[in-house]
Amino acid sequence: MPSTSKRPTAIVIGSGVGGVSTAARLARAGFHVTVLEKNNFTGGRCSLIHHEGYRFDQGPSLLLLPGLFHRTFAELGTSLEQEGVKLLKCEPNYMIHFSDGEKFTLSSDLSVMKTEVEKWEGKEGYTRYLEFLKESHGHYELSVREVLLRNFEGLTAMLRPEFLRHLLQLHPFESIWTRAGKYFWTERLRRVFTFGSMYMGMSPFDAPGTYSLLQYTELAEGIWYPVGGFHRVVEALVKIGEREGVDFRMETAVKKILLSEDGGVAKGVELEDGRRLEADVVVNNSDLVYAYEKLLPIKTPYAESLKGRPGSCSSISFYWALDRQVPELEAHNIFLADEYRESFDSIFKKHLIPDEPSFYVNVPSRVDSTAAPEGKDSVVVLVPVGHLLEEDRHASQAHQLSASRNGHISSASPPDQPGLTPTEKQDWPAMISLARKTILSTIQSRTNVDLTPLIIHESTNSPLSWKQTFNLDRGAILGLSHSFFNVLCFRPTTRARKPGAFDAQLLKFGVLGRAAEVIIDAFRGRGKDIKGLYMVGASAHPGTGVPICLAGGALVAEQICGDYGVDIPWKEEERKGRDVGGKRKLDVLESPMWLDSWEQWVSVLIYLLVGIFAWLWMKFR
């Protein structure tokens, strides 16, 4: 504990999922916590857009890995149900639309999957599907246990024997596409079981095979949706925090993080209006690259190296209010491009919008009637696109969420519009028009429904607005990439890093420089950390996605409590055998001892007798 007898103080910058969950945990542990949010709403990307009775999830719309949500609320001494968060199961998971008019229903129902898989790959195909589930189940369990619930503060964390012995089982050096090819022998099914890499902001041809865990959680645990929108989870965490005494201050932007003269200790923050707030602990939940580049008082080579790391994709997102329901669309729909690999190359190599993109269509009103007026639908379309290039990173003009009515939409993309097919630079107005035109045309050709005359209101987000509203580096909606050299000990750590003596030189060597940086930092020990400054969110360990950021919030809170000698309430409760993380002591699984049945003893005796007789026969024959 700090030397003062007062409660230790903490400031959290940003009220995203990672920030509010960390704040609630710290407050429960006895910290006096203040959350500073630049916008007038909480949740960051996990927020809502409203228009005359229509409701849209601005960012996440799929609740995956439900165990991590239940664990978070249990460790905060409550539950989703107690906080009034009702989860609805989406069935089917997705309707996948192909360019040839065929459809594939993805479901957590094995009987449905048996029919769907056997339609394309026969009975042996279903057997291979079960083998795929077995492998992805291994990826899921190992990743949660050894990665998501553990902190990787440096090289030594990655060299743990219990982790290394499982490393190759995670298939980090093979792509999801390669692993899928071992189980699915048609191009169609390989596409069905790899598009989910988009949720990590990566191409399936580059994403490590480990991330088939996403397919596993969808297929085994299902896809869920909170009634009232995904922001209901954030609202519940905010209420828990407020009960514990957290002070949430909206429209309070942070100008910089205050450090000691030697840059080794965090002292507090300076606000945009010039006020200074002091604290024992500062937790940054703003975009990590932005924080290192803009909030720390001195720009360092490390901040420069973060800007040079590969980022995830961005998106052009449309939020459409329809004047009637469209039953041809399920709650979750995927429209896959015919030129599958080329579409991902356009996004991740050229940083443009593909000529024919794969895209996701969410109809929240299909599962939650409160998302739209009676008899109408709210529709969200997410089109993955390349993140901002260097020339657009520092765009000075404001780019906010934009809105328009049908008169603008129906004529927004005439065939002769100039600049409609940008191929060499990021002409965002043209790319948004191109995306709208392509999406409406694709939906019509594959469902026989023309949405254009049904849209009575549209809001849009683009990489520019993502950057402007949420300070996202390059407008990358999922933070830094999750390639191998951007995860585990190579990902920015939860403790903020002080500049190293060789950072400028290592900057020139890319991935090799990053590996060398990790090795050097191992020798620097705690001397590499800025004391009292921590990072939580998509670009810090363990990574991106709402459930992953919840796991990150737990890691950071436990790390802070350990650093300041504060008891961790949920760990104490776990030791006392209370219901934490969904299990009591009576429910802990223990594998049976070997030789615990008479059949095993008889088998051993038979083997011994056969062995003895064989030895005697060989000796005395």
Curated annotation (Swiss-Prot):
Pathway linked to the protein: Carotenoid biosynthesis; lycopene biosynthesis
Region annotation Disordered: where it falls in the sequence: 394-425
Protein's membrane topology: Single-pass membrane protein
One Pfam family this sequence matches: Amino_oxidase
GO MF: oxidoreductase activity, acting on the CH-CH group of donors
GO biological process, one term: carotenoid biosynthetic process
Bias kind Polar residues: ranges: 397-414
Protein family according to the UniProt entry: Belongs to the carotenoid/retinoid oxidoreductase family.
Protein role: Phytoene desaturase involved in the carotenoid biosynthesis pathway. Converts phytoene into 3,4-didehydrolycopene via the intermediary of phytofluene, zeta-carotene, neurosporene and lycopene, by introducing up to five double bonds into phytoene.
Protein name: Phytoene desaturase
Organism: Cercospora nicotianae (Barn spot disease fungus)
